[in-house]
A protein has these predicted regions:
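Short, compositionally biased
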Residues: 2-172
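An exposed tryptophan-centered "aromatic clamp" motif
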Residues: 144-177, 181-220
Length: 220
């Protein structure tokens, strides 16, 4: 019974929030989220709003991503530094993969500036994908080129502002990057609808090694 649930946060159509559509011109529109409950479940408007593919000025635009986080405390320092503390409003997951079946790297390296995450709490707390992405790019360039990191090379091709790629990022963004483990957590919790991800006990757990969640019900 939804009425028995405790509401954590409510939203109106004109507020930027999880699930909103993000467009090629850097704008966004309502994706239908109206309430988040304390158990991590959500209430979506019915009918769910459709993308608005034409601006009021009748200019065409494309959906290139979906907002998965707007909580400032879950947005990394590097992301905030890139655009300025007050200019970061949310994080967006791309609609399409840059590539499929592509290798992360041709080499194995433990970089000092990129944290190894083992426990659930470490995974949850690692929220700056842009930091990790930038440090790995710096390392790749220092050893002669990004070709040794195919996944990163694919992302950088998307970030090429002079390419004809339809998913290149708007100029008022950080550009695309590979999410950190904590950002993947937020994607699974906020867009994937996995109840365990919203559990404070899981977010602060010291469990590490190989583990998996079972019996989480249907994912929307």
């Amino acid at each position: 019974n939804v009425t028995s649930k405790k509401v954590k946060q409510s939203f109106t159509a004109d507020e930027l929030k999880i699930g909103d559509y993000f467009y090629s011109d850097g704008t966004w529109s309502d994706g239908g989220l109206r309430k988040i409950y304390t158990d991590g479940s959500m209430k979506i408007a019915s009918p769910k709003p459709a993308p608005v593919l034409q601006t009021k000025s009748e200019i065409e635009r494309r959906v290139i991503g979906i907002v998965f986080q707007t909580d400032p405390s879950r947005i990394g320092t590097a992301e905030k530094s890139k655009l300025g503390e007050g200019n970061v409003h949310g994080l967006v997951m791309a609609l399409k993969n840059t590539a499929t079946d592509i290798q992360w790297s041709h080499e194995e390296n433990n970089l000092e500036d990129v944290k190894d995450c083992w426990s659930k709490s470490e995974i949850y707390s690692d929220i700056s994908g842009l930091h990790n992405y930038t440090k790995i790019l710096d390392h790749a360039n220092s050893i002669g080129g990004i070709e040794a990191y195919p996944a990163f090379e694919a992302v950088e091709k998307w970030n090429d502002m002079y390419s004809i790629n339809e998913y290149r990022p708007p100029r008022n963004t950080t550009g695309w990057f590979i999410p950190s483990s904590g950002q993947w957590w937020d994607i699974l919790q906020n867009l994937g609808g996995c109840p365990a991800m919203a559990d404070k006990g899981q977010q602060t757990s010291s469990d590490y090694g190989d583990f998996r969640w079972l019996g989480q019900g249907d994912v929307p």
